[in-house]
């Protein structure tokens, strides 16, 4: 894969969240908190299983606005509490598993707030990158709202 192809199939986002790093990290690893903010607008996260340890698995069940239920799953490759998560990402598709990509989320203390930097790489295409970008913006908007006191 060339450098330009790698850049074309990855995305990076940074968001400042009004919460302590430990609390923001927990929002990614505690299933009950996670379900409150995960997903783009109109999507409901109905179940989340999260075993946030190296080699641990996660599986998320989401209901899309049009009613379709989709499943996301992966494995934690790195868990550095409360600084960093690295995990694989794959959609369950047609009874199988779709292409696997990789997500890195870094949590940096910024006074009483937290800078969250997200890198989603190894996406299968530019179209996939664009769809995931839309989803991540919605997720981070919800997370920001939840920590601002306006529950997502």
Describe the residue ranges of each PLM region.
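Hydrophobic ligand-binding cavity/cleft-lining segments
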Residues: 1-44
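Intrinsic-disorder/low-complexity, polar/charged segments enriched in Ser/Thr/Lys/Arg/Asp/Glu/Gln
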Residues: 8-14, 21, 45, 57, ...
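Short beta-edge strand/loop motif at the mouth of beta-sheet-based domains
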Residues: 12-13, 32-69, 151
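Hydrophobic/aromatic beta-strand elements that line small-molecule binding cavities or substrate pockets
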Residues: 15, 48, 72-78, 101-108
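A short, structured loop/turn motif at beta-sheet edges
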Residues: 21-22, 51-53, 77-84, 106-115
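Hydrophobic pocket/interface hotspot
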Residues: 24, 34, 58, 76, ...
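Helix-adjacent hinge/juxtasegments
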Residues: 59-81, 87
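Beta-strand/loop substructures that line and gate deep hydrophobic ligand-binding cavities in soluble
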Residues: 86-137
């Amino acid at each position: 894969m060339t450098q330009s192809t790698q850049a074309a199939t990855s995305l990076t986002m940074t968001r400042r969240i009004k919460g302590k790093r430990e609390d923001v990290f927990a929002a990614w690893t505690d299933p009950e908190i996670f379900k409150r903010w995960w997903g783009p607008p109109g999507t409901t996260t109905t179940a989340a299983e999260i075993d946030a340890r190296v080699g641990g698995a996660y599986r998320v069940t989401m209901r899309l606005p049009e009613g379709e239920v989709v499943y996301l799953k992966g494995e934690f490759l790195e868990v550095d509490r409360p600084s960093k998560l690295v995990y694989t990402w794959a959609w369950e598709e047609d009874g199988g598993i779709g292409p696997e990509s990789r997500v890195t989320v870094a949590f940096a203390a910024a006074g009483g707030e937290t800078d969250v930097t997200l890198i989603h790489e190894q996406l299968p295409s530019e179209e996939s990158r664009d769809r995931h970008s839309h989803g991540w913006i919605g997720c981070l908007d919800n997370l920001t709202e939840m920590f601002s006191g306006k529950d997502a």
